[in-house]
């Protein structure tokens, strides 16, 4: 059986991205591998072994084109309202809180936030199918 271990995003500014993921999700640098032309930085927290891999290509000087195929990464939290307020307090500009409904039933409460390079992250209230 396959096990998801990380999701990689290409970033322009190492420090700006590390700061965002630490403030937003409590992710810390677990490993940093410098290959000369590029750098891999693995971020994680105590909640899960799943990591966000930041790739810094040193020759890249302009923002990446994100395209229209990629959607988002999703994380769950215990209290989505409190997390939304905390992120606002950190100056991270989370999007509006929304309810995800199907057949008149609320399946989840969530919001989106974008990292410094524009990658969207969905923050979902933990519960139901989103544990």
Q: Where are these predicted regions, by residue range?
A:
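N-terminal beta-strand motif that seeds the catalytic metal site of vicinal oxygen chelate
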Residues: 1-18, 70-75, 124-131
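Exposed loop/turn and edge beta-strand positions of beta-sandwich/beta-sheet ligand-binding modules
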Residues: 37, 69, 107
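Short amphipathic alpha-helices within nucleic acid-binding modules
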Residues: 20, 80-86
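Vicinal oxygen chelate
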Residues: 75, 84-131
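Core segments of cupin and vicinal oxygen chelate
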Residues: 2, 8-51
């Amino acid at each position: 059986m396959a096990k998801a271990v990380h999701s990689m995003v290409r970033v322009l500014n190492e420090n700006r991205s590390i700061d965002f993921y630490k403030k937003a999700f409590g992710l810390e640098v677990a490993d940093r591998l410098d290959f000369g032309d590029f750098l891999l930085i693995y971020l994680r927290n105590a909640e899960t072994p799943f990591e966000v891999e930041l790739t810094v290509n040193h020759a890249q000087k302009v923002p990446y084109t994100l395209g229209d195929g990629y959607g988002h990464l999703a994380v769950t939290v215990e209290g989505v309202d409190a997390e939304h307020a905390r992120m606002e307090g950190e100056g991270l500009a989370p999007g509006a809180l929304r309810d995800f409904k199907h057949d008149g039933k609320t399946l989840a409460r969530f919001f989106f936030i974008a990292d410094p390079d524009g990658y969207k992250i969905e923050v979902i209230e933990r519960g139901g199918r989103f544990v």
